[in-house]
Amino acid sequence: YNDPYIEINGAKISLDKINSIFDYEKLDKFANLSKQNNILEIGAGSGRTSQSILTFNNVKYVICDIPPALYISYERLKKVFPDKKIDLVYMEQDKDKLNTKINELDISFIMPDQLNLIRKNFFDLTLAIDCIHEMDKKTVKKFFSDINQLSKIFCFSVWKKCSLPFSNILTKDHVFDYYQNGYEVPSNWTKQFEEELDFPSNFIFCGYKIE
C-alpha cells in the first residue's frame, strides 16, 4: 500500500503497524484472542486491526463497515490472506442465506443494516477500535443494541472526551465524555477491563461482558 515507513534493522515500521501492536496487546489481554472463534469488527477502516488478529489466530471474522472503508479493508485482506475464503456479502438480505455465507467464509464483509439478520449470540467477541466516537449518539445506540443481541463480550477504544463539530454544532447530544457515561453503555454490560492507551494518550480501551 506504499504507506510511509522507516526501516529499522531491515524491518519496515509504520504508524499503522505500531497502532496495531498496541491494539492487539489490549485485545489479547482482555479477550484472550486464541480462545475466540467468531469475531465481529465494527468500523474496521483500513483493516489494520483485523490483519493483526488474523495473522496470529485462526478465527471466523466478520467486518461491518460502510464504503469506501469497506472496500479498502476488503482489498487489503484479500492481498494479505490469499488462501482464505473472503467475500463481500453486503447485498444479501435473506437471513438464512446470509448466515450460511458467513459460516462458509473465513472473512465476510457486511453493512450495518445486516446486523439484525445474523443469528443471536453468534459472536464470541465484538470490537470497535477508534470509530465509535465518529458516530452521533443515535447511531452508537443502534450499534450497541445490535451488539447486545449478537455478542458475548465487547471491547472498544475511544477518545476520553470529544465532540462531533458538524453534528448540530457541539450540542449536548454530540459530546462524548467517557467518564460521564457519554457513550451510554447498556446497563446489562459489566465492565471487566479498562486501560488508558499509551498512544494516542487521550484514548481509553475498555472491555465488557454482555449479560
Model regions: which residues?
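Conserved Class I S-adenosyl-L-methionine-dependent methyltransferase catalytic core
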Residues: 1-34
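Class I (Rossmann-like) S-adenosyl-L-methionine-dependent methyltransferase catalytic domain
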Residues: 5-7, 11, 15, 69-118, ...
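Conserved class I S-adenosyl-L-methionine
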Residues: 35-45
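Conserved SAM-binding loop of SAM-dependent methyltransferases across substrates and taxa
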Residues: 46-57
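A short acidic, Gly/Pro-enriched loop at the edge of an enzyme's catalytic core
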Residues: 116-126
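A short beta-strand submotif of the Rossmann-like class I SAM-dependent methyltransferase core
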Residues: 128-131
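A short, conserved alpha-helix within the catalytic core of class I
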Residues: 134-147
